[in-house]
């Protein structure tokens, strides 16, 4: 099993994720090979909260160009984690 620090890469700070945070749902970019059980354990260990549900999605990279060179941004996996009523993650509070 992976370390919690390897599973969760960074939080997603967008207008939509801030609206979801009001509903006790927090969004993270996670390791692409991580499954829902690993994501749940990582969030519970790192933030001392109770996770009720985990939704994941794979996001394809966007095509980008740099002059004549074409490429793509990297693919990534996002997870939306629903917490128990009354629990919250402090890193989302001050944004």
From Swiss-Prot:
The keyword rRNA-binding applies. GO terms for molecular function: rRNA binding; structural constituent of ribosome. SUPFAM superfamilies: Ribosomal proteins S24e, L23 and L15e. GO terms for cellular component: ribonucleoprotein complex; ribosome. Pfam families: Ribosomal_L23. Gene3D superfamilies: 3.30.70.330. The keyword rRNA-binding applies. GO terms for biological process: translation. It comes from the Bacteria. Keywords: Ribonucleoprotein, Ribosomal protein, RNA-binding, rRNA-binding. PANTHER family: 60S RIBOSOMAL PROTEIN L23A (PTHR11620). NCBIfam families: PRK05738.1-3, PRK05738.2-4, PRK05738.3-2. Part of the 50S ribosomal subunit. Contacts protein L29, and trigger factor when it is bound to the ribosome. Belongs to the universal ribosomal protein uL23 family. One of the early assembly proteins it binds 23S rRNA. One of the proteins that surrounds the polypeptide exit tunnel on the outside of the ribosome. Forms the main docking site for trigger factor binding to the ribosome. This is Large ribosomal subunit protein uL23.
